[in-house]
Amino acid sequence: MIDSEGYRANVGIVITNDKQQVLLAKRLKQDSWQLPQGGIDFGESELDALFRELNEEIGLSFEHISILAKTPKWLRYDFPDYHIKHKQKPVCIGQKQVWFLLRLISNENNIKLNMHTQVEFDDWAWVDYWRPIEDVIDFKKPIYEDMLKALAPVLFNNQHKIPNQYLRPLKCSAIILDK
């Protein structure tokens, strides 16, 4: 659903393991990596969208994960002009996302990328917490930095160090949902 400002509402998903690594997924038939994310349908809650996207993209359901935290507000990014479909109405200029921090509490064999008719990813890997900022497409890097900075205190119990190259000011702090 696109709002009056041209942003599509979206949930982003950060899945962690017991080594505090995150699941990074490779876009189908592309050399492009990102965290799972997806649109919030009309009338759908953030949590409903989270579980639908989690199942469609990664094959996991609520019994496989624990929800740790979320970002408290929408984090926005704009599409580069070449991504904007100017003839489509309403025009979507970017996405606004709320991000959820999850912990995988089941076996990673439950991760299945082919659970939906429209498969989005063809590979995945556990990576260092900060690596998604480097691997994601350039126009998403600032939102990844903002989101990972906001969620890090929850995952690392305030015992984290933000790498020096990430100098953007902290935009928000995570809301703890479960501990």
From Swiss-Prot:
Q: Where is this motif: Nudix box?
A: 38-59
Q: Which cofactor does it need?
A: a divalent metal cation
From the record, what ranges are coiled-coil?
A: none
At the top level, the lineage of the source is Bacteria
Q: What is its EC number?
A: 3.6.1.-
Name the PROSITE patterns on file: NUDIX, NUDIX_BOX
- Gene3D superfamilies on file: Nucleoside Triphosphate Pyrophosphohydrolase
Which keywords accompany this UniProt record? Answer: Hydrolase
What does the entry give for GO biological process? mRNA catabolic process
Q: Mind naming one GO cellular-component term on file for this protein?
A: cytoplasm
Q: Which residues form the signal peptide?
A: none
Q: Which GO terms describe its molecular function?
A: mRNA 5'-diphosphatase activity
Q: What class of enzyme is it?
A: hydrolase
Q: Where is the Nudix hydrolase domain?
A: 6-149
For this chain, the family text in UniProt reads: Belongs to the Nudix hydrolase family. RppH subfamily.
What this protein is reported to do is described as: Accelerates the degradation of transcripts by removing pyrophosphate from the 5'-end of triphosphorylated RNA, leading to a more labile monophosphorylated state that can stimulate subsequent ribonuclease cleavage.
What is the protein name given in its UniProt record?
RNA pyrophosphohydrolase
Organism, scientific name: Ruthia magnifica subsp. Calyptogena magnifica
**The encoding gene:** rppH
